[in-house]
């Protein structure tokens, strides 16, 4: 196979190695699924550090529909005569064939396809590639199912498949039901390649709903949050119930344990970010002192979502769904599967509420960031929705996150420190959002 992967791969939006110096992309594993369709595993080497593996499905010669003909074209291969390779996920026939392999629980070479028990796959549905920006590629089959194909693959048990399977088989109503998956083995390690879940038709992302609410609030400067038509507090209460339900199921199905507060982990992140971001350095000592208050505390842990925020929840006509159980981006797989306090997920949601409110002030620019009335409205909106979320969580679980104030604050600080590092590197204009939150939590 002689496709120009070196040129093509770094241009893809799901490519995750942009912060590293790219060296080469070599097709080390090629599995022929049928005569015109290959599953290719690339080994991607960098100037420094460990190589990574990426998955590409290559459709030969038959071009995708016109809408995707440019973006899907990989290039020409002259080793086997003149032929053109395309990203197969943009070809409806190839995407449909993948679904049939999952439906039949087929094995092709070392690729194992599996359908979940007692499910029906929509084999007659028309596939289309999702336009959402993400690190994987998703193909939506009408209003019935979504096939997520992992691009950068890592060894070990995939937490997204694992936790979706546990929650679906337990009958939890707050996840999209897992329908099937496919995987392979490299160097005696399992590698998840993709998964199929029910498609959340007619759903709205929690982030978009929250932004609509804050927009309505700021447009009505003389009204309080509970007086504006787009008040989000009721949805926040129901969202708290949904998160608590998922936590309860994970704890019941996979068990809980008592472990020390992860002091070393949070201190390592704090030191790393403080070294890189001067704005954080004056507050690093105070943050460390807050962490060390929990040094001798045992906390209850179980499997959690791990990267929960308003962009990871969908509101359907039936209620809230939690999606994307892959854990914190960039972390090793064993860390993403490690049990953690449910306060980690709660803190992620509380941080997301602050972003939804204060992002609006930054977007308005000029004096908006310093407008005391708008700032008061933003704080009011955050407090109202945080309270409603915690009320809902407490109602469903019997445990109020606010009763664990020191632990919750520590996880909020850890999340905000992570955000400081991210914003300083990628969105400097947003850096005030996590910095102000850190000052608020510290009482400065």
Curated annotation (Swiss-Prot):
Q: Which GO terms describe its molecular function?
A: ATP binding; kinase activity
Family matches, as Gene3D superfamilies: 3.90.1200.10
Sorted keywords for this record are: ATP-binding, Carbohydrate metabolism, Glycogen biosynthesis, Glycogen metabolism, Kinase, Nucleotide-binding, Transferase
Q: Which InterPro entries match?
A: Aminoglycoside_PTrfase, Kinase-like_dom_sf, Mak_N_cap
Q: Which biological process terms from the Gene Ontology are attached to this UniProt entry?
A: carbohydrate phosphorylation; glycogen biosynthetic process; trehalose biosynthetic process
- What pathway is this protein a component of? Glycan biosynthesis; glycogen biosynthesis
EC number per UniProt: 2.7.1.175
Q: What does this protein do?
A: Catalyzes the ATP-dependent phosphorylation of maltose to maltose 1-phosphate. Is involved in a branched alpha-glucan biosynthetic pathway from trehalose, together with TreS, GlgE and GlgB.
Q: How does it assemble?
A: Monomer.
Name of the protein in its database record: Maltokinase
**Gene source species:** Mycobacterium sp. (strain KMS)
């Amino acid at each position: 196979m002689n496709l120009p992967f070196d040129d093509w791969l770094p241009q893809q939006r799901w490519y995750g190695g942009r912060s590293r110096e790219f060296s080469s992309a070599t097709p080390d594993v090629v599995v022929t699924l049928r005569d015109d369709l290959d599953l290719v595993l690339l080994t991607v080497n960098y100037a420094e550090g460990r190589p990574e593996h990426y998955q590409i499905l290559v459709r030969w010669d038959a071009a995708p529909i016109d809408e995707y003909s440019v973006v899907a074209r990989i290039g020409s291969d002259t080793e086997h005569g003149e032929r053109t390779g395309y990203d197969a996920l943009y070809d409806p026939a190839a995407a449909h064939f993948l679904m049939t392999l999952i439906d039949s629980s087929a094995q092709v070479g070392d690729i194992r396809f599996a359908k979940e028990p007692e499910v029906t796959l929509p084999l007659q549905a028309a596939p289309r590639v999702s336009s959402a920006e993400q690190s994987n590629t998703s193909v939506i089959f009408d209003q019935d199912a979504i096939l997520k194909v992992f691009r950068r693959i890592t060894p070990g048990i995939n937490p997204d498949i694992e936790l979706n399977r546990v929650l679906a088989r337990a009958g939890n109503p707050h996840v999209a039901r897992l329908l099937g998956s496919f995987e392979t083995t490299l160097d005696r390690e399992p590698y998840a390649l993709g998964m199929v879940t029910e498609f959340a038709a007619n759903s709205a992302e929690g982030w978009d709903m929250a932004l609509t609410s804050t927009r309505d609030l700021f447009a009505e400067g003389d009204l309080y949050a509970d007086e504006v038509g787009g008040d989000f507090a009721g949805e926040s209460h129901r969202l708290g119930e949904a998160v608590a339900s998922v936590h309860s199921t994970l704890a019941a199905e996979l068990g809980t344990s008592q472990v020390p507060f992860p002091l070393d982990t949070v201190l390592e992140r704090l030191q790393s970010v403080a070294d890189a971001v001067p704005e954080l350095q004056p507050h690093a000592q105070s943050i460390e002192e807050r962490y060390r208050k929990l040094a001798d505390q045992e906390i209850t842990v179980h499997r959690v979502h791990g990267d929960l925020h308003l962009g990871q929840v969908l509101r359907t006509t039936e209620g809230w769904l939690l999606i994307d159980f892959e854990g914190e981006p960039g972390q090793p797989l064993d860390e993403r599967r490690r049990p953690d306090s449910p306060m980690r997920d709660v803190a992620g949601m509380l941080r997301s509420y602050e972003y939804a409110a204060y992002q609006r002030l930054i977007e308005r620019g000029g004096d908006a960031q310093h407008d005391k009335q708008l700032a008061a409205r933003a704080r009011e909106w955050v407090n109202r929705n945080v309270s409603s979320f915690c009320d809902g969580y407490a109602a469903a679980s019997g445990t109020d996150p606010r009763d664990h104030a020191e632990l919750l604050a520590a996880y909020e600080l850890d999340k905000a420190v992570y955000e400081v590092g991210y914003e300083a590197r990628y969105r400097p204009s947003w850096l005030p959002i996590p910095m102000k939150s850190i000052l608020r939590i510290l009482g400065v």
